[in-house]
Amino acid sequence: MALMTGEQYLESMRKLNMQIYMFGEKIENFVDNPILRPSLNSVKATYDLAQMPEYEDLMTTTSSLTGKKINRFTHLHQSTDDLIKKVKMQRLCGQKTAACFQRCVGMDAFNATFSTTYEIDEQYGTHYHDNFKKFVEYVQDNDLTVDGAMTDPKGDRSLAPHAQADPDLYLHVVERRPDGIVVRGAKAHQTGFSNSHEVIVMPTIAMGPDDKDYAVAVAFACPTDAEGIFLIVGRQSCDTRKLEGSEIDVGNSEFGGTEALVIFDNVFIPNDRIFLNGEYEYAGLLVERFAGYHRQSYGGCKVGVGDVLIGAAALA
């Protein structure tokens, strides 16, 4: 499949059946919702820019797995030059949207999970790395947007996941079956989940052997509209102004970001989408590697938004 255009991205999102709730009601048409649409426009920009010849070198690259042309947001970094182009791409997207364009967490999750699954397989003889490579190829071939979910509600932070009064405060495995696992819990502050085709769920802290049944010691991927997933959209400053049809207090009217509490209510994950399952000693390593990549991402996107603010101030 060729790289999607921005309009093709929007049409692909219309085909998803996500369970999204806002103001106590289910959102039936989230793509055209006035509050949610600016967030989708930010992701759309990453597709539009990839179609422009002047930005091709930053926005696209060659897949290390298939040799095909791909969007750089789905790339597995191969060199220092890749990392430099990554951060320049993020600055460009920040300059073009003056907002969060919501694909950085998924990209950073890709690269952290790729190396971690290799090391788990080396120690335990598992097949997580092959599972993950097949998932990445699927994402690249279909030019999909992938969210990364890390933060659990946590509850009492002085206690480990298994010691919480409510077991659902950390996403955890409630059933192991021959064909996969069933998980329950939530991930909080999920930027871009409602604008993504797939999600990679990762650990949120390091842990010990008593926590191996928790999704904090599990990594997996699933469609964002998988059965049992529900999104509760968080509030933004002046968000209801977008419903009034005026320009007062709207801020950045075209682009924006949304966050959601994502509930996993007994969601089934097949074996070929599992990348870590109870190997608790690798939970902290995966978190640490993700954090390193993600700190670099902030050095690009926030600088791009800063460029816009500096320019606006200069014109004021």
What are these regions (language model features)?
Residues 1-61:
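Acidic/polar, glycine-rich intrinsically disordered N-terminal extensions of enzymes
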Residues 18, 144-146, 179, 197-199, ...:
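Structural beta-strand/beta-sheet cores of well-ordered domains, especially the beta-sheet scaffolds
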Residues 24, 183-185, 264:
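Buried hydrophobic positions in well-ordered alpha/beta secondary-structure cores of metabolic enzymes
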Residues 30, 126-129, 133, 193, ...:
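Conserved structured core elements
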Residues 48-146, 198:
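Internal helix-loop-helix
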Residues 114-182, 186-193, 209:
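Glycine-rich, mobile lid/loop segments that gate access to catalytic sites or pores
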Residues 186, 190-243:
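A short core secondary-structure module
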Residues 245-316:
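Glycine-rich beta->alpha junctions and the first turn(s) of the following alpha-helix
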